[in-house]
């Protein structure tokens, strides 16, 4: 396996950070951090997330800025972690049947049916409404990443109440 240069890893980490900074404020909340870690294949419990946040949060503001994340994670990041992001893109592409960079309702319905999970019209509408955050009628890779992150956060029991 070819080695990845640290500058490439930082760029990839910045892209990942931006994808999970759901409110685009330049920092990650506990929920956003949990979703990011889950996407990297790291599966900490809720109490571990709190502890990790406290350790990473060097300026004590209760959230993680990109530079804090780099200091904490770069020594441990490896190609295997970055491959998980590639796998997410592969899943997205499998739904994006025409390869135009977005998933339509028809593509979502077709893919779900092909996987043995046909959707009712209502289920399809609810899924599209939840995932399509900008309301353009299709799901972009960013929206897909966010919905996958939200699913991971829900799974971890870290949803905001």
Curated annotation (Swiss-Prot):
Top-level taxon of the source organism: Eukaryota
Task: Name the residues that bind Ca(2+) 1.
Answer: 21, 23, 25, 27, 32
Q: Which GO terms describe its molecular function?
A: calcium ion binding
Q: What is this protein called?
A: Probable calcium-binding protein CML16
Q: Which PANTHER family match?
A: CALCIUM-BINDING PROTEIN CML18-RELATED (PTHR23048:SF52), MYOSIN LIGHT CHAIN 1, 3 (PTHR23048)
Keyword check for Transmembrane, yes or no.
no
- UniProt-annotated binding residues for Ca(2+) 2: 57, 59, 61, 63, 68
Reply yes or no: does the keyword Amino-acid biosynthesis apply: no
* Residues at which Ca(2+) 3 binds: 96, 98, 100, 102, 107
Induction trigger: By touch and during darkness conditions.
Function (record text): Potential calcium sensor.
EF-hand domain: residues covered: 8-43, 44-79, 83-118, 119-154
